[in-house]
Amino acid sequence: MNAITKSFTGRKRIRKSFGRIPEIAPMPNLIDVQRASYEAFLQMNVSPDSRQDAGLQEVFRSVFPINDFAGRGRLDFMSYEFEDPKYDVEECIQRGLTYAAPLKVILRLTTWDIDEDTGSRSIHDMKEQPVYMGDMPLMTDNGTFIINGTERVIVSQMHRSPGVFFDHDKGKTHSSGKYLFAARVIPYRGSWLDFEFDAKDLIYVRIDRKRKLPVTTLLYALEGANYLAQREQKIAEGGDVEGLDIRGMDQDEILSYFYEAVPFTRLGGEWARPFDPDAFRGLKLLSPLVDADTGEVVAEADAKLTARMVRKIAEKTRVVQVGRLDILGRFLAYDLVNENTGEIYGEAGEELTEDRLAALEEMGITELPLLSVDGSHGPWIRNTLAADKNSCRDEALIDIYRIMRPGEPPTKETAEAMFHGLFFDQGRYDLSAVGRVKMNMRLDVDAPDTLRVLRKEDILRTIKIMCELKDGRGQIDDIDNLGNRRVRSVGELMENQYRVGLLRMERAIRERMGSVDIDTVMPHDLINAKPAAAAVREFFGSSQLSQFMDQTNPLSEVTHKRRLSALGPGGLTRERAGFEVRDVHPTHYGRICPIETAGRPNIGLINSLSTYAKVNKYGFIETPYRLVEEGVLQDGWKYLSAMEEEKLVVAQADAKQDDQGRLTDELVSVRRSGDFRVVPPDQVTACDVSPKQLVSVAAALIPFLENDDANRALMGANMQRQAVPLVKADAPLVGTGMEAAVAHDSGATIVAKRRGVIDQIDGARIVVRATDEAGATQGVDIYRLRKYMRSNQSTCINQRPLVKVGDTVHAGDIIADGPSTELGELALGRNVLVAFMPWNGYNFEDSILISERIARDDVFTSIHIEEFEVMARDTKLGQEEITRDIPNVGEEALRNLDEAGIVYVGAEVNPGDILVGKVTPKGESPMTPEEKLLRAIFGEKASDVRDTSLKLPPGTTGTIVDVRVFSRRGVDKDERAMAIERAEIERLTKDRDDERGIQERSFYNRLRERLIGQTAGAGFKGIRSGTPITEEVLDEHHRATWASITVTSDEVMAELEKLRGEFKEATRRIDARFDSKVEKLQRGDELPPGVMKMVKVFVAVKRKLQPGDKMAGRHGNKGVVSRVVPVEDMPFLENGQAVDIVLNPLGVPSRMNIGQILETHLGWACANIGASIGDMVDEYQRTGERKQELLDRLHEVYGDVIFNEDVATLPNEQLIELANNLRKGLPIATPVFDGASIPDIEEMLEKAGVNKSGQSQLIDGRTGEPFERQTTVGYIYMLKLHHLVDDKIHARSIGPYSLVTQQPLGGKAQFGGQRFGEMEVWALEAYGAAYTLQEMLTVKSDDVSGRTKVYEAIVREQDDFEAGIPESFNVLIKELKSLGLNVELEQSGL
């Protein structure tokens, strides 16, 4: 039993773990996927000389240098650097800006003088200059981006890896059902190359999915061996290769690559051939097989040659006789030429018929080189050659050109250039390092991964492997294997996007170089960075993979950053994705979670990374394994991708082992090549590092996951992400040990950056004096706590300190809790007392019955913060104004507004209340004489403006928690804006003064330490030279003068000088930071065009749990609150404690999520143990007795290891704090697949002193009678989900109407009405309610004039009105008119 954590918070509440398997490998940081990828892209903290050729550096290197068309100028990329971002993260969120740093690129423009006679070039000038290339968004510490003030996440994309893939159509294409094999070469960017067999067994090629060509046309177009040999020779001789005429592959070369030549020899009137075991294996002989040398019969006619017989024959026989039938139908391997006359007897690939063979025999030919076409080598390439109309390179190139660019007249040069650009030009074709590595592995070739274009060998080898597949040798590829799918993380996605922007820019630069005087311009004159900046902006703003962060709670943030999507640009589409690509694959083990995936339409397309998974430099997902040698587990672990794992035999983490790590079972359950087997221990080559490496973070938070049905586990994992942060959070009593890791890595808590001592603390900040091991001050860290801030989902972000002044913290310790965290652990819900029983039908169909205590004590109360904003614009009629002076509004409505017309912080507001008063100038309307008179008398009147104030929308009631006022630069700030600015400057001043105070204290302490014991030097008034410096001497002088004291020791003087320099520099940095922040505050804000002032108001709404709210446990056990029952009516225990929640027991058996029952029992045991510890603590604090009893109780529940290491050594004060934290229940961890067993739960129930069955006798609160039988009662961790009835409930009397149909809009967001549809009309017809129906279809919907008449009638208190023609009828008539049918209502003849 091991404790999960021993951090600062871990010591305050120790979680007992039931895990038996030791955790060998540490879990990687949960959001490293994002951070590592973007850091590798920017290489921001790497010096320009040391940067790797990757990411941004690689993009610039690939696009530059840019040459002009005349060859006189060249623009080279030297390096890039980032300046400091203009605003920090918090300022960007407040002001609605993008958190980004300006990117400066140093470019060199070289110009040449060209000699017109000789054409030689000499350098004329070189100019280097940094050029601004737009702003590059930066990632926050939490792996997110701030774009226009909102936090966004770039989701990683899964796509098919570049490389070569072999597949077949599964027999679906052709009616005969035969497999048509295909191969596809996928580059990272560039043209796709597809090879395929057709129904006639000919091989075709497609380039970019265009019309197909015989594959031999492509082979003709490739450079021939003869040409390549000539080229090599020319280069070796130092000659020029430009003039060489390129010759392609010919028939001989093509055939000789794909087929061996078998020499058939004529011996004494009979033909003979070498005996090849492969060619004869499996054949049924039509005639006896005769040894050509001895004449001996080695196999009888009608015999079927088995592998054994063939081996036996091959031992003795070299050449065998063949009949004429064996030769007929075979093909010549190469041209048969009479060497004397040059006459061609037969061409390569020609088929031997009876006549042709007879003619050759007559000519006296005794040796025929024939292609090795037989049962194991098909004539596919030869047949394709015969069907191909082209016969040379030029014809082939023109054929390819016509298909790629139809309608353009081909020439030899253009066809040559186009073909070269398709696959052999680095600028247009890039396999990427991954593609090359994958291709090398699949084709069994060895090319360096820097070679990113195709080679002739790659194409030939691909075709050869496809032919082998057709011949029945080899395996096709599984495209759903994670060895063939890779992850594109944020850095790579950004790299591709930036490349697009730079390529757009490149064209503009080239044209500009041609249109200006190249000798006089500087690099920045040629650059317009807008295309690059626009590409970045477009990616972050509107890409499918750039998503508004799910910020409901810390878990949803972490999960969103670890998400893998198969959708998005260059990925799959929902409609096209089949079952296979969505399914769980054996290679997902430890890499992608088999449980957590998105809901219905996206199931299997949006996945989550497993807990231990990492993404390697090639983009493949890796998972760690412990290596095993000769049945012994080795120390350490190794991260392996799916390809590397293929060869391994992997045992599970729970395989039994002795103390030396030797596997002890006779047979071990393992995974090998995607199958489950049992093997002896000596065959095992690896072992899992942890049982939870299989699942994702959310699934690893579900205790007893192994006892839940997979569908319910999926719901449980997904619903935890929807849990709303509660006002009072509880960490789960029954956890899994993952809670602390999620809280730490999510960024919701505040984590100490370095070791230190808490110096000051209040509700909004923590000041830490950073120290080294010896206690010397290293600096000051000020941590600002986020107070009542709004998240993306309108939940409340609020942080609370966990430390007190004087506490020592270490780097990585959690010093403040955030939303949904408690004592440094994730706390999504509350532990509540639950009974499984029916109660008057109120828990029918998963309804949940709750006690009034839950609503009264704010057990499930959450705070939601709504943001409202209003802008004062400069309109054509004049400026809008934010003011308290609003026409026709009484003083009562203005009671919450200050003199500037903005609501006070702390005001309680209700629907319809004015938050910000605003007036807009009205258009000039013609005045009546009376108005003119009034205007002449009273001057300007308020009637010139109309009220456009920001009012609180219906359905919201709350408290104002924050107001922010933004004013345009140059516009005078109002009193409220000045007050906010003053408060902010005061806060910054306090930070500066505190930081300076700590630095000063530290400086003078260190100065004092160095001076005491030294001898004073000359030059300081008050201390005579040669006097020993003591504490008394120093105390006589003000400490500000100590820095001027000199000493006789040169060494100490140098140290003092260094100390002074460090102090001066630290103070300068603090002041510079303060000045910069104040300057930003006073500068005024960047607002959208035409906006003079903007006000944001934040309203906090407190939501109690009420009927209609959705709740859930962690096991997919969800339901809606049906009724709140008075505490006195709820069933209660024999000790008088009423249960909090009543759940329906029928929700368990059919759902098969038994985990909730086990959690209930274990929670019951934990709570009772906690209660007994609480009693002992109370007694001890009251009387000082029972301390030993308390220690014994802790020893009993925690076991020897934890007690001796962590509890027994605690000082008294910390022991009491620990015991008090256990009062609500002993927290335990039951890790997934390695948790508490049934005997463990029974043992815990026994220790708690309750019934081992986990059931208790309940008494009916209404009658006071005991229930007939005992009931399962215990503590379950319940969550309140983000589906709140207050957000869904909606009512409308009058609201907006659709412009065309004039019918009310639909939906809460549009403040719409209820649709009275076709079926509802039938219902009213059935009742014969004619008048009601008429109202529904006319005046209550789209009869415009009727609506007005009804209103007027009601105002006049009359009850008669007439319905007119619904507007939808007029729309129908207009529709008919558009078809040329004139429909008119003729009333004259009536």
Curated annotation (Swiss-Prot):
Under Pfam families, the record lists: RNA_pol_Rpb2_1 (PF04563), RNA_pol_Rpb2_2 (PF04561), RNA_pol_Rpb2_3 (PF04565), RNA_pol_Rpb2_45 (PF10385), RNA_pol_Rpb2_6 (PF00562), RNA_pol_Rpb2_7 (PF04560)
Q: Which reaction does it catalyse?
A: RNA(n) + a ribonucleoside 5'-triphosphate = RNA(n+1) + diphosphate
InterPro entries named among the record's database cross-references: DNA-dir_RNA_pol_bsu_ext_1_sf, DNA-dir_RNA_pol_bsu_external_1, DNA-dir_RNA_pol_su2, DNA-dir_RNAP_su2_dom, DNA-dir_RNAP_su2_hyb_sf, RNA_pol_bsu_bac, RNA_pol_bsu_CS, RNA_pol_bsu_protrusion
PROSITE patterns attached to this UniProt entry: RNA_POL_BETA (PS01166)
Q: What EC number(s) does its UniProt record assign? A: 2.7.7.6
Q: Which keywords does this chain's UniProt record carry?
A: DNA-directed RNA polymerase, Nucleotidyltransferase, Transcription, Transferase
- Entry GO terms, CC: DNA-directed RNA polymerase complex
Provide the assembly information: The RNAP catalytic core consists of 2 alpha, 1 beta, 1 beta' and 1 omega subunit. When a sigma factor is associated with the core the holoenzyme is formed, which can initiate transcription.
UniProt cross-references to PANTHER family, sorted A to Z = DNA-DIRECTED RNA POLYMERASE I SUBUNIT 2
Q: What does this protein do?
A: DNA-dependent RNA polymerase catalyzes the transcription of DNA into RNA using the four ribonucleoside triphosphates as substrates.
Query: Which family does the entry's similarity section mention?
Result: Belongs to the RNA polymerase beta chain family.
The protein in question is named DNA-directed RNA polymerase subunit beta
Q: What species is this protein from?
A: Gluconobacter oxydans (strain 621H)
